[in-house]
Amino acid sequence: MRKSEIERETKETYVKILLNLDGSGSFLGDFPVPYYKHLFSAFCFYAEWDVEIMAKGDVEVDPHHLIEDTGIVWGKAFYSAVSNSNFLRFSSKIVPMDEALVMAVVDISGRPYLEIRDDKGILNGRLIKEFLRGFVNNSQITLHIWLLSGENLHHIEEAIFKALGLALGEASKEVPNLKSTKGKIW
């Protein structure tokens, strides 16, 4: 099975993630920022990954460090779990949530790149960008997020995690042969 366990400890945070890419969509553990626990649960549910997390940090100062470090650890866990398997590689999904409409396009490429198209600047200064940047850089995927419409930040961010879960869940599915003109990704 495609599993990994990664942990990171700094003076500001401690994050440990156990990831099973061939799971059922469960998110277990204690995450001290309830809103992000909600978003991470949706991510796992739609990706059909099992994730167990142990996390603590200086959230009384600001949750920035913990959200960013969670992205870093989750990205490393994904890379570790997927890198020795053959996977579909590409996927794109469009997800509505009420007035919000978000598209996520992924390539498990070995080349980290994050593009967030947000013409109205709705996500400027939001912690979701820190999570995504940490995840993308450490999982070595290419990710495009397009905010097609929306005004409610909760709806937009939840649609992002649902679209990302659906797209990455599909792109990481095992297949007989890896599609790459180079013959390999990593």
UniProtKB/Swiss-Prot annotation:
Gene Ontology cellular component annotations, sorted alphabetically: cytoplasm
- Name listed for the protein in its UniProt record: Imidazoleglycerol-phosphate dehydratase
Source species: Dictyoglomus turgidum (strain DSM 6724 / Z-1310)
Q: Where are the transmembrane segments?
A: none
| Taxonomic placement | Bacteria, Pseudomonadati, Dictyoglomota, Dictyoglomia, Dictyoglomales
Q: Which Gene3D superfamilies match?
A: Imidazole glycerol phosphate dehydratase, domain 1
Fetch the PANTHER family from UniProt: IMIDAZOLEGLYCEROL-PHOSPHATE DEHYDRATASE, IMIDAZOLEGLYCEROL-PHOSPHATE DEHYDRATASE HIS7
Swiss-Prot/TrEMBL catalytic activity: D-erythro-1-(imidazol-4-yl)glycerol 3-phosphate = 3-(imidazol-4-yl)-2-oxopropyl phosphate + H2O
Taxonomically, the superkingdom here is: Bacteria
Q: Enumerate the Pfam families for this protein.
A: IGPD
Gene Ontology BP terms? L-histidine biosynthetic process
Keywords of the record, alphabetical order, are: Amino-acid biosynthesis, Cytoplasm, Histidine biosynthesis, Lyase
Q: Name one GO molecular function term.
A: imidazoleglycerol-phosphate dehydratase activity
Entry similarity comment: Belongs to the imidazoleglycerol-phosphate dehydratase family.
Q: What are the annotated disulfide bridges?
A: none
Q: What is its EC number?
A: 4.2.1.19
